Amino acid sequence: MASLHLGLSSIPRPSFRPTCNLIIRCSAERQALFNRIAPVYDNLNDLLSLGQHRIWKRMAISWSGAKEGDNALDICCGSGDLTFLLSERVGPRGKAVGLDFSNEQLLIASTRQKLRSKTCYKNIKWMEGNALELPFPDSSFDAVTIGYGLRNVVDRHKAMAEICRVLKPGSMVSVLDFNKSINPLSTAIQELMIDNIVVSVASGYGLENEYKYLKSSIKDFLTGNELEKLALEVGFSNAKHFEIGFGFMGNLVAIR
């Protein structure tokens, strides 16, 4: 029977970095934000992407290299979309772990699991945890995914280093997120859509301020080239970023 473990700290412990207090405060604020949007998160994803996010997520799973019998990890799993797809890939003989720092998102994921009948979904374990301090030994997983999560962590270098640490040599991580384009026109169109469509729709759910955060988070994110360099810096042997969704989305694939 699948389990829901909620005993892990979801706020980073102080580190040697001089900005550790700021990191803790920002992490707590982001955790609270995702708890607030949890009840309508799935509906908004479908509405705002016209269902296209499901295609992008299947592409991300394919790029992860997960296969039958594998031990796979989905970081920043939210309500579990990628975790369920990973579970289908690894099958009943494999294992899938969905980790997130939002208790509310995990409760929704666990509820969704109980309503689904596929045998493979019994191999899923939900955990509340911190992407900056993954609670797993080195070389634990055959595949890792992170969807729309790396952009939201407060220390991307540490998060990628942790992913590299828990992956087995030769295994891959697939990182799906909004694409920070270097094309001024693409950036302008993306921001226009966020301001006039995304925020407008979210305001109907009382979440205008929460989704205004999206534009600033993309501005603060890394370009495809920067993501590739980051992956190599933390120890991955190879990395390639792909633009998808008309260039508005991106997927980094990195090999341990």
Model-inferred region functions:
Residues 28, 118-120, 176-234, 240:
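C-terminal alpha-helical "lid/dimerization" subdomain adjacent to the S-adenosyl-L-methionine
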Residues 38-52:
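Class I SAM-dependent methyltransferase Rossmann-like catalytic core
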Residues 234-256:
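Core SAM-dependent methyltransferase catalytic element
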